[in-house]
Amino acid sequence: MNPNQKIICISATGMTLSVVSLLIGIANLGLNIGLHYKVGDTPGVNVPNENGTNSTTTIINNNTQNNFTNITNIIQTKTEEKTFLNLTKPLCEVNSWHILSKDNAIRIGEDAHILVTREPYLSCGPQGCRMFALSQGTTLRGRHANGTIHDRSPYRALISWEMGQAPSPYNTRVECIGWSSTSCHDGKSRMSICMSGPNNNASAVVWYGGRPATEIPSWAGNILRTQESECVCHNGVCPVVMTDGPANNRAATKIIYFKEGKIQKIEELTGSAQHIEECSCYGAKSVIKCICRDNWKGANRPVITIDPEMMTHTSKYLCSKILTDTSRPNDPIDGDCDAPITGGSPDPGVKGFAFLDGDNSWLGRTISKDSRSGYEMLKVPNAETSTQSGPVSHQVIVNNQNWSGYSGAFIDYWSNKECFNPCFYVELIRGRPKESSVLWTSNSIVALCGSKERLGSWSWHDGAEIIYFK
């Protein structure tokens, strides 16, 4: 082939490739236009509705590639309608307790940045359950951990984190600032309340949906405080128990009814309960029950029964002869429904809980009657109403060779069961005052939930070796 023929051949080949490329481009353009018309005519694709709560949103992303072909991605997302929680279901039958979560915060904190906390609890919402606690604004290994035995300081905050993890500066969310707290989800959004300030003039800030909604000043000038575990909501109404006044004498307790963070009604405590602190509340059958701490007199626990629809309440004492506060005397022959049963030393009380459901009633208490060590669950039928009621079943949660602490109730009200399954947590306190070789006071958490099966006991103690912190 001579040079002229080669040139003609190469030119012809180039022109052929150019024509083919042009035809491919025209075909792609036509296909892209056709796809756009088809998307516009499809009845299943809706215009985004930003005002509705039960809408379909369509997002069309046109991405231009290097070969000038437009690729259309269609993403459809549905937003579920948010509704207020209603406490219409009964409690589930419980024959024993199964492990739900254990964060091992102190063990992990020996070699990691774990926050110093106390007064922990769990609380659930439509998206799942989270752990909560009052942080001390420092880590276990931090120098500021010295002095964290004290309850109230400007450095404390209510934090929350994913259930099962240990709280660190990297995985926690600050809910509000303060040294006493409660928090609950109404089905639409979360309400959190924190108390802060000096003992003689503390105040509460109520947060709803991540924003401050209400402020409450002290009404007795003596450590305004609240539940230290979750509140409970019914049809948007969230009652919260608050106390202001002496810890060892008559104090001023109020039940405050909130809706979307705003006060709907305030009631002074009525009934036979003489002292109320640190209530543990749960809801079922449209009623909220709060089992509290009488820090003044009673080793039997006060019970507040709340009607959230009428926004009214009554109070009394747990009738059972099984005493559940610490310190406490030996269990008496008879309980008392209307008056505190005195006795026990040296500690005046500890936060605790119970589930009161006729034959399906369970009480929690420390195994030691004198100190915050060990923890057990006792099934006590009719504990709320019978002065003769005693245990028919028993399960060890923490053995008596290990420290416990506060305990409280919570329920995952969104678990789609035909009933509300009771759950509880136990605070496992480590450090001072019992273990003075370290400078800090902190805790880990263990949580369990009810089971219809009859499961065995095991000790879910903290497990950290304090000697490793020296």
UniProtKB/Swiss-Prot annotation:
Sequence segments annotated as region (Hypervariable stalk region): 36-88
Record region (Involved in apical transport and lipid raft association): 11-33
Post-translation changes: N-glycosylated.
Source species, domain of life: Viruses
Places the protein is found: Virion membrane; Host apical cell membrane
Record: residues binding substrate: R118, R152, E277, E278, R293, R372
Sites where the protein binds Ca(2+): D294, G298, D325
Enzyme active site: D151 (proton donor/acceptor), Y406 (nucleophile)
Entry EC number(s): 3.2.1.18
Record comment: activity regulation: Inhibited by the neuraminidase inhibitors zanamivir (Relenza) and oseltamivir (Tamiflu). These drugs interfere with the release of progeny virus from infected cells and are effective against all influenza strains. Resistance to neuraminidase inhibitors is quite rare.
Annotated glycan sites: N51, N54, N62, N67, N70, N86, N146, N201, N402
Annotated Pfam families: Neur
Record's keyword terms, sorted: Calcium, Disulfide bond, Glycoprotein, Glycosidase, Host cell membrane, Host membrane, Hydrolase, Membrane, Metal-binding, Signal-anchor, Transmembrane, Transmembrane helix, Virion
GO biological process, alphabetically ordered: carbohydrate metabolic process; viral budding from plasma membrane
Protein topology in the membrane: Single-pass type II membrane protein
Name of protein: Neuraminidase
Gene: NA
